[in-house]
Structures are given as C-alpha cells and as structure tokens.
C-alpha cells in the first residue's frame, strides 16, 4: 500500500488516481493524525508526504511527522513533497530519514 499524506484534496485525488491506474493499493489522508493511525497499524510500502498541513510554509510540520513515522516504521521509504522547498529543508528531510 502507498500512503499519501496531503492536506490538499486535489493533490490526494490526482496522486491516488494515477497510482490506482497503475494497479497500486493506495490510501490517502489529509494530515498527521490520520497518517500516524495508519502507520501504527500497517507498514506502507511507500509514503508520499506533504511538508505543510497549515498556512505555515516552514516545513516543520512535515519534518515532525516524518520523525514520528520513522519511530514506528524506520524502514518505510518516504518521499517528501512541497511547493515551498529549499535546499535547507531538503537536507533536513534527508537527515530525518526521507
């Protein structure tokens, strides 16, 4: 299963549609709370995760969620997504396990 975590319903829908057409099992959730519930109960094969879940564009919410996910599922690969990226944020994401 591929887990999509993004507060933007259009992003969740488009990614889900494309992946399902490619025959992947997909679950999509809007935020950290729902994501952690899933990650605790099942190990996704891959996580596609937004970095921002509120109006803040710092990426801190995504980094926090990434660290929480890695506590429960350290071996699950995570791809971080954001419209507000920077080199520093990319480095922080890789250091946190993405």
Place the predicted regions along the sequence by residue.
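Two-component/phosphorelay signaling modules centered on CheY-like receiver
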Residues: 9-27, 33
């Amino acid at each position: 299963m591929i887990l999509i975590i993004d507060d933007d319903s259009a992003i969740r829908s488009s990614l889900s549609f494309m992946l399902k057409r490619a025959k992947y099992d997909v679950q999509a959730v809007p935020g950290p709370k729902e994501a952690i519930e899933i990650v605790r109960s099942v190990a996704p094969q891959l996580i596609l995760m937004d970095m921002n879940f509120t109006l803040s564009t710092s990426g801190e919410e995504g980094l926090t969620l990434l660290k929480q996910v890695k506590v429960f599922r350290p071996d699950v690969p995570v791809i971080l997504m954001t419209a507000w990226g920077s080199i520093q944020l990319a480095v922080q994401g890789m250091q946190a396990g993405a």
